[in-house]
Each structure stands twice: as structure tokens, then as C-alpha cells.
């Protein structure tokens, strides 16, 4: 009931997370009520909560700053910058990129692309996240560099894949620390994803 909703909010869950929990519980109650012909009302139906509570607005990175960052990536030319460049022109989530195998990068197709699929060390956020992503611009450059790197590892980014786990938190901390010097305040690696959405709409 509402006490459980208030408990979740008190724990610090943002509105969208509260919504997912409540939806799951609502479905269980609906099933039980239907299956056992119970004469009671589902207490989780019609429950109000602020879905945007605790969610900070994520800003897109302006295109001029994207180009500046991409130029810096090609100048520094190391695996951290390859990951930044890869994300910048694909709209991938950082964890998706960090957990790639080199065999997920298909450069010899008519349209070079990443075949993004779940792996035991890095699942995807949703079933719809499995997709082919075209490689262009900075992301194609990064993919080409990755295909030639780390001959002793199947991973595109070995430093973030150890003990059968992709350490996307470590990647996020390192890359956001570097990125914040070159993008507006409030922008993060995830902002490339929002920028890609805006670029595709333009």
C-alpha cells in the first residue's frame, strides 16, 4: 500500500525506480486476485507517485563540443579515448561499449557496424537494446583502432573486463573525470546518448 511506496521513497529511490517496483508488485497482486478469485481490490492500482522525483535532467553535449572532444580523442589516441569516440557517434550506453568483444565489431560489411548483443559479463538493459549500430565518423575510427589492439584479449576494452564482469562504474568515473574539462557543466558520458537522439531528430 502507500506505506510501501513511502518506504521506497525514503530509501532514496528515484521516481522511475519506484514506478518499476510498484508495477511489478501490482502485476503479482493482479495475478493472485485473478488466479484465486479473490474478492479484494489491488492496493497498488491507482497509486500516485512523482515519476520525475529525484531524476536530474541530463543535458546533451553541443555539437561543437562533441567535435572538440573527438579531435582530442584522435590526438591522445589511447583506449580510454577510443571508448569516448565510440560512444560519441553511436549513442551507445557506456556499459554497452565497455563490454564489447572485438568480434562484435564488424568492419568488413557493406556498412561497418557493431553487433550489440548481451554477454554473460555484460547484459543489456532491455531486450530491445540488442541491435546493429552503424559506425561512422569518430566511432568508425575508434572501431578500426580497437580491431588492431590487444591481440591477446578477446575484449575490445580489456581493462574494464575482468573476472567475467564489465566494470562500467570504473569506466564512467575515469571518462567523466576527463570529459568534464571539455563539455558544459552537467554533461557526462551519458550525454552523448542524448546528443545522438537530438542529432537524429534534426
Residue locations for each model-derived region?
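Short, conserved phosphate-binding/catalytic loop or strand-edge motifs used
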Residues: 1-6, 45-48, 197
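N-terminal core-binding DNA-recognition domain of tyrosine site-specific recombinases/integrases
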Residues: 1-30, 55, 76, 164-170, ...
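Short amphipathic helical patch at the helix-1/turn junction of helix-turn-helix
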Residues: 9, 87-88, 201-202
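Basic, Lys/Arg- and aromatic-enriched nucleic-acid-binding interface segment
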Residues: 15-24, 34, 38-100, 128-129, ...
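Proline-centered turn/helix-capping motifs that create local helix->coil transitions or kinks
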Residues: 33-42, 106-109, 146-150
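Conserved tyrosine-mediated DNA breakage-rejoining catalytic core shared by Y-recombinases
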Residues: 46-49, 99-144
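Active-site-proximal segment of tyrosine recombinases
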Residues: 96-98, 187-188, 197, 202
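Active-site/catalytic core of tyrosine-dependent DNA strand-transfer enzymes
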Residues: 119-120, 136-185
Amino acid at each position: 500500500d502507500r506505506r510501501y511506496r513511502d518506504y521506497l521513497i525514503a530509501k532514496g529511490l528515484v521516481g522511475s525506480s519506484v514506478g518499476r517496483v510498484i508495477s511489478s508488485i501490482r502485476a503479482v497482486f493482479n495475478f493472485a486476485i485473478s488466479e484465486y478469485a479473490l474478492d479484494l481490490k489491488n492496493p497498488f492500482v491507482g497509486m500516485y507517485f512523482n515519476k520525475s522525483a529525484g531524476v536530474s535532467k541530463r543535458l546533451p553535449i553541443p555539437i561543437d563540443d562533441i567535435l572538440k572532444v573527438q579531435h582530442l580523442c584522435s590526438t591522445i589516441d589511447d583506449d580510454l579515448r577510443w571508448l569516448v569516440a565510440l560512444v560519441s557517434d553511436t549513442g551507445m550506453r557506456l556499459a554497452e561499449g565497455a563490454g564489447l568483444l572485438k568480434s562484435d565489431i564488424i568492419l568488413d560489411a557493406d556498412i561497418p557496424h557493431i553487433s550489440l548483443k548481451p554477454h554473460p559479463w555484460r547484459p543489456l538493459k532491455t531486450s530491445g537494446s540488442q541491435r546493429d549500430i552503424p559506425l561512422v565518423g569518430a566511432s568508425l575510427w575508434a572501431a578500426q583502432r580497437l580491431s588492431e589492439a590487444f591481440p591477446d584479449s578477446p575484449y575490445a576494452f580489456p581493462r574494464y573486463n575482468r573476472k567475467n564482469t564489465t566494470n562500467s562504474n570504473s569506466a564512467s568515473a575515469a571518462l567523466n573525470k576527463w570529459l568534464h574539462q571539455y563539455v558544459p557543466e552537467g554533461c557526462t558520458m551519458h550525454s552523448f546518448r542524448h546528443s545522438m537522439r537530438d542529432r537524429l531528430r534534426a
